Amino acid sequence: MIIYDNIHGYINLDPIASAIVDTPVFQRLRNIHQTGVLYLVFPTANHSRFEHSVGTYHLATQMIEKISKKQPELKITSEIIQLVGIAGLCHDLGHLLFSHLFDDYFLESLTNHNELKTLTKNVYHENRSITLINHMVDKYEVPLNKDQLKVIGDLINPKESEYGKWKPKYQVGRWIFQIISNPLNSIDVDKFDYLVRDTQAVGLKFGFNYSRIIEDAKVIENKICYSLQCSEDIYQMFFIRYRLHRQIYNHKAVKAIEILIIKLLIEIEKELNISQYILDPEKMMELVDSFIWHGHTNISIKKIIEEINQRKIPKLVYQDVSLHPCEFDEDKLKQSFDANTYHILRFKVGYVGGKSNPLNKITFYNLKNGKIISENKVRSFSLLITQKHQEYFLRVYCMNLSLLDKFNEYFEELSQSKNGSEENNED
């Protein structure tokens, strides 16, 4: 099978990958937006998990093929190349409606649910991906055996502790866990694809040279290393991640709609108990984006859908950004407003998940002699790179639009009081 992709061009899928794509389990990814509710604010962000998964397959295959040709001593077989590609293809198979929103906010809001407490292994999409792959293989007779499925599953949800249980013919090195979803330094083909795909979808005119990063990838001391010449491309990749999160994924209107979608999912949960769908692969497949929009008779559900469609969304009335967790006196706010009239949102935005310079976790090598470069030389490659790599946000949204003016007045007074206090401290 050959697929034309607007990012990578023509993509050749091997016979097993083609068999996977031609199943209802995989085709459902067409009905899950890659970026959740983003399309409701940025209309061109209409791409799906389907395209991203095929793109990740392409880049995963490309990376391990490049490493294999460059380093034949690693003894990477065509079967291993195939399994890495399939892991890339299926890494997001377990995503449900609105992608990360379902996991990170809706399921998190149900942590007190008695049965969910015992189902933590099923909650995250990586584990659901493995469940659906096994279901797909059994139901649609995809030609993958248990040993191959073990490798694919451990690559999707990296488990180096399971490496010793692989058949010896697959044990080419623990570096193999750093291709699809890299727990070591966050450089992986999943990120390559979604950063390029998402920036193009929303019309942002910047990018990074992921092809160069793949070309220079080399296994040294059981780690995938990169030439120092790639350091600026890699840093640009992390900067783009930061900018997308700051400017696009966490846009004030996007988060406002997410607040309503979470409310909507909680109301649907009361009616249909959809959190339990994750126990059954067939029921899981029903949870695509369109699931929430139609067929509801419940008045509360219909009201929220109407608010979203009529753009009666929560309004941002206050925001604070800091290099440290933001302080906010909610008790004081409660003296003026009922708790159900506002929503407080806290989140972090950074180059990676933590505070440190992402380059500090990457092993670079000298392109001329192939030897690892000391950390000091890496750190000094630019004096202009910031030492701060994470910001903390606090937002307050007005949930009752009839109170919008009162909220604005409250936070205007708060801002003036805060500024006056800071001026007095300076004196």
Predicted features along the sequence, with ranges:
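Sequence-structural signature of the catalytic-core scaffold of metal-dependent phosphohydrolases
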Residues: M1-I86, G94-Q319
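Terminal helices and disordered tails flanking the catalytic cores of nucleotide-processing hydrolases
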Residues: I262, L272-D427
